[in-house]
């Protein structure tokens, strides 16, 4: 019966490289992997089953991930970073959608644990402020939480600096000459929505600009929410010269509503979004926004989780990634004599 050593000799690589290719425990170039797989096939080599290996080493090389179902492509862009990083590290990914349902979320977590995943990545807004008994029953399972908080269970956390991002957005509008600046927030029970709004308020306070309650509306981070929020602002009276819309999906809804109502973006109203989702540059006008490093969020989550799985660190970590401004065409400079 052929061995890994035989495959290594035929493929012209080391035995450890053969092991990594067969067990998918490390990224190996496509050319070398093809040579190894071809040699294994030629020698009729059969690898031990994944189940047998996992029972032997108490590892499945599988990560579970829970995501809140949303029409927002932000989640898909983050998952792409997670999936690609898992592949490069030789891990499989099991992805579960919670659809915002608390019971489904708990059921999915239990299912993933029963499948003996090595660790969990959670990106569920419904987890915020929750205490989950399942993590008390499985205290040793490594968990990384992405982009939400605070949590009532111990976990590492990867998040965007939303306070800084909200400040950047409002401060940019101010630097462009705007003094009447409204805000469409996300759901303010959510930490990230709170922080973006706080950043907006901090920028206005620093420059001594007033808050007009008629220009501040809470919405839901979805297109429809932005659409309805803008109509509420219009119904309350004169518009501000600029709006900070706290994510790009809501900004898309605002642009749609503005077009229906004959409000020209950006000449009648400047808009800045948040997230820099892929379609932001294809909106009309292309959306000025705050870039979240979405791929890097996913990558950092995998790297942090693997450190916990491999027991490289025991301390709970909070890793904060910094947002940046992306200038496009939905904001124009404002002059006091403009109407």
Where are these regions (language model features)?
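Short beta-strand elements in bilobed, periplasmic/extracellular small-molecule ligand-binding domains
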Residues: 86-97, 201-224
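N-terminal helix-turn-helix DNA-binding module of bacterial transcription factors
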Residues: 1-59
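Flexible loop/turn connectors
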Residues: 229-339
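An alpha-beta-alpha
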Residues: 169-207, 214, 317-331
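N-terminal helix-turn-helix/winged-helix DNA-binding helices
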Residues: 1-2, 41-74, 78-80, 88-89, ...
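Hydrophobic alpha-helical segments within soluble ligand-binding/sensing domains
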Residues: 158-183, 195-202, 223-232, 251, ...
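Periplasmic-binding protein-like
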Residues: 109, 116-124, 182-184, 237-247, ...
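Flexible loop/hinge segments that line or gate small-molecule binding clefts
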Residues: 92, 100, 122-168, 189, ...
């Amino acid at each position: 019966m052929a061995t890994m050593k035989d495959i290594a000799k035929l493929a012209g690589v080391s035995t450890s490289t053969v092991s990594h290719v067969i067990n998918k425990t490390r990224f190996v170039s496509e050319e070398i992997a093809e040579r190894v797989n071809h040699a294994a096939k030629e020698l009729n080599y059969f690898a031990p089953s994944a189940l047998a290996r996992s029972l032997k080493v108490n590892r499945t090389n599988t990560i579970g991930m829970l995501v809140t179902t949303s029409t927002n492509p932000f989640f898909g862009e983050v998952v792409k970073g997670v999936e690609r990083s898992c592949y490069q590290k030789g891990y499989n990914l099991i992805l579960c959608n919670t659809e915002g349902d608390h019971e489904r979320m708990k059921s999915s977590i239990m299912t993933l644990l029963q499948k003996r995943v090595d660790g969990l990545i959670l990106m569920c807004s419904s987890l915020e402020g929750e205490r989950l008994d399942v993590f008390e029953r499985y205290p040793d399972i490594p968990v990384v939480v992405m982009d939400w908080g605070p949590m009532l269970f111990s976990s590492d956390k990867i998040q965007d600096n939303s306070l800084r991002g909200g400040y950047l957005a409002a401060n940019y509008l101010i630097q462009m000459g705007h003094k009447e600046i409204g805000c469409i927030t996300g759901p303010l029970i959510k930490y990230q929505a709170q922080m973006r709004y706080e950043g907006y308020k901090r920028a206005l306070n620093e420059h001594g600009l007033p808050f007009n309650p008629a220009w501040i509306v809470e919405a839901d981070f979805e297109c429809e929410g932005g659409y309805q929020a803008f109509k509420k602002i219009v119904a309350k009276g004169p518009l501000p010269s600029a709006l900070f819309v706290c994510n790009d999906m809501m900004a898309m809804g605002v642009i749609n509503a503005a077009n229906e109502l004959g409000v020209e973006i950006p000449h009648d109203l400047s808009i800045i979004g948040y997230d820099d989702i892929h379609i932001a540059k294809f909106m009309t006008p292309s959306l000025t926004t705050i870039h979240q490093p979405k791929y890097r969020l996913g990558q950092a989550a995998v790297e942090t989780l693997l450190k916990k799985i491999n027991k490289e660190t025991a301390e709970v970590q909070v890793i904060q990634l910094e947002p940046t401004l992306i200038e496009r065409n939905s904001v124009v400079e404002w002059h006091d004599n403009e109407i």
